[in-house]
């Protein structure tokens, strides 16, 4: 379970996707781009936060 994930509007999600695509077009790997944008979102987000739980289906 992860606490404190930013709750993003559709517009904010779209901007994040566009930022990831921009970084990838500059030669960054997808994983690095996602990690960088996630860090930027966490650092700059001032809205609500959600609690999310991810379960591994292989168990």
From Swiss-Prot:
A Pfam family of this chain: UPF0181
Please give the start and end residues of each transmembrane region.
Answer: none
Under InterPro entries, the record lists: UPF0181
Could you name the domain of life of the organism this protein comes from? Bacteria
UniProt record similarity statement: Belongs to the UPF0181 family.
Query: HAMAP family, per this entry?
Result: UPF0181
Protein name stated in the entry = UPF0181 protein YoaH
Species: Salmonella arizonae (strain ATCC BAA-731 / CDC346-86 / RSK2980)
């Amino acid at each position: 379970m992860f606490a404190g994930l930013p709750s993003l509007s559709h517009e904010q999600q779209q901007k994040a996707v566009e930022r990831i695509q921009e970084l990838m077009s500059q030669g960054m790997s997808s994983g690095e781009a996602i990690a960088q944008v996630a860090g930027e979102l966490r650092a700059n987000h001032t809205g609500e936060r959600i609690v999310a739980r991810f379960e591994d289906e292989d168990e």
